[in-house]
Amino acid sequence: MTDSHQVIFYPVNNGDTSQIVLASGRRVLFDFCHRNTSEDSETPEINLNKRLTDELRDAERDYFDVVAFTHADLDHIQGSTDFFELQHAKKYQGDGRIKIQELWVPAAMLLEDADKDHQQEEFVLLRQEARHRLLEGQDILVFSKPQALADWLEPLLLARGEEPSARDHLFIDAGTIVPGFDLEKDRVEFFCHSPFIKHCEEGDIIRNSAALIFNVRFSAGGETYDYLEVGDAECSDLEDIVNITRYHHNGDRLEWNLFNIPHHCSYRALNEEKGERETTPTPPVRDLLLMGRRDAYLVSSSKPIPDVRDSYAQIQPPHIQARNAYERHLKDIGGRKFLVTMEEPNSNKPEPLVFEVSTGGVTKISGAIGGPAIITSNPPRAGLRAR
């Protein structure tokens, strides 16, 4: 098996969808945001439904090995309950729906509340799907096990004649390696940075704080390369990750060749204060940015971020002040480039950003997924990790 993997980011405006395609052919999809407007060829957002369906068809598949929803905000789940087959009800099955072999969700998604007027909201349908799979004991991993979730699950297991601990193997704690992928066999492993149990035990659940965050480590050509897959975290969440990871002597899990930056380039992932021209990261977040390796890439899943006067007054992300901070720190580490999904190759007709992870490093490439990819001349590669 050739050690050549791909990481793809799809241009879905201020939203998230990315995919890992392993050398073995296994596919892991993070989040799903299909914009209905994208079905109009005049809009810049990609028609995600068509794109993913075409990619799977070309690979002779009707499923993803893993679909991970980092959290339940609409810009991370929009259109998912129309696209994917759901096991909990027959009306969400068949008719060309794409299957999910294993669903990854934060515990917070199973604890979401909704009144009777919102039972058909997508986050509720995904909550029902996750609860169904967990209760059936198959095709799911749940990240963290807060007491509120145990209080819901254990009486139901007892009613089925099962032990309260019968689903413990389906819960994954922060600071551990996710089962099902092996660095030696699969050339990849997933280290869970977040969520922590406290994210669901301190009153109201804050989706962004309780979201999935991973260090994804690839093996290629005898070396390893690291990808930080981050949801809509804020600076306090990243500070916790940096401090706790270091405390447990896992500092290498903070290193990165590729970093999907949080929350569509929001300044709040760096500091609670935006700054006039540039956001100043808090010390732990600054440390995380400086853990990037030479020739590394930063990716913002967002609208374009032009450096013009109006951008500096922007209230909602993306924030030019955050971009300026990211680019400054990328320069400090000798990084390669800061890329925005809705800017590449241009803002009128953006295309998926495709990175190849292979012998020598992480390379931004162009070309159709599943077809022959054309590596740019003098390919820019994110450097090696010391072993």
Predicted regions and their residues:
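Active-site-proximal structural scaffolding
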Residues: 13, 41, 76, 96, ...
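Flexible, acidic/histidine-containing loops and adjacent segments that form or flank the divalent-metal
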Residues: 1-5, 62, 81-236, 303-387
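Active-site neighborhood of phospho(di)ester-bond hydrolases with catalytic His/Asp-centered motifs
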Residues: 29-33, 63-77, 104-108, 227-236, ...
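Short, glycine/charged-enriched secondary-structure capping and boundary segments
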Residues: 23-24, 44, 82-84, 118-119, ...
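Active-site metal-binding motif and surrounding structural segment of the metallo-beta-lactamase
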Residues: 42-103, 249-268
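Short, solvent-exposed loop/turn and secondary-structure capping segments
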Residues: 18-20, 30-31, 40-42, 78-81, ...
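Conserved beta-strand hairpin/beta-sheet module of binuclear metal-dependent hydrolase folds
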Residues: 2-62, 210-236
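Long, structured stretches of catalytic cores involved in phosphate-ester chemistry, encompassing
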Residues: 236-339
